[in-house]
């Protein structure tokens, strides 16, 4: 399989061959390709867990990572300030099955699909954000363009959004609603 970087992911590791444990691009050392939102999934359904970045200040200051994560940020002792020991790098977050998603008001159809995936498969914490009150999902560049209409001009770094494909403000509100419903699924310490 070829790519613009010769099949190499973060840190120059080959992400297409091997045991699937190399090619990480996250502080958690989880595989870079795992959990990405892929082209067509917002229309056809998401059938796997998603990767999510959480605010560093929310992650546990007591326990920095749990399996399947193999590490945490090098600055975790300073930047992880959360009091919930269940919220660490590698934590699986999910919406409880008792929550009726059909009874909620979704601002975008994409938000509802993301909520269904969060309830059925969960979201794994794979990295951190500096923004204190947001979460960020991993998304394939092609999916960002085709499914959401998001694009970045490589020359200028400017972002553009095709609002005929998605209401970006509505999607942000939907993701914030999903984040408010998520609960940590207990896991063994790494």
Q: Where on the chain are the PLM-derived regions?
A:
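A cross-kingdom marker for long, charged
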Residues: 86-102, 115-190
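A surface/extracellular/periplasmic glyco- and lipid-processing/surface-interacting theme
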Residues: 1-114, 119, 123-129, 142
């Amino acid at each position: 399989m070829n790519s613009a970087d010769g099949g190499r992911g973060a840190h120059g590791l080959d992400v297409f061959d091997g045991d699937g444990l190399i090619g990480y691009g996250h502080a958690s050392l989880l595989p870079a390709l795992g959990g990405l939102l892929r082209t067509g999934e917002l229309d056809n359904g998401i059938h796997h867990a998603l990767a999510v970045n959480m605010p560093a200040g929310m992650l546990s200051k007591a326990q920095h990572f749990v399996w399947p994560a193999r590490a945490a940020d090098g600055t975790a002792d300073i930047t992880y300030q959360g009091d919930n020991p269940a919220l660490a790098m590698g934590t699986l977050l999910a919406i409880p099955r008792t929550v009726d998603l059909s009874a909620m008001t979704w601002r975008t159809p994409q938000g509802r699909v993301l909520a269904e995936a969060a309830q059925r498969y969960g979201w794994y914490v794979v990295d951190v954000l500096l923004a204190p009150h947001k979460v960020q999902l991993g998304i394939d560049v092609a999916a960002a363009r085709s499914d959401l209409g998001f694009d970045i001009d490589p020359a200028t770094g400017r972002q553009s959004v095709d609002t005929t494909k998605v209401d970006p403000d509505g999607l942000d509100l939907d993701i914030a609603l999903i984040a408010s419903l998520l609960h940590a699924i207990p896991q063994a310490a790494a």
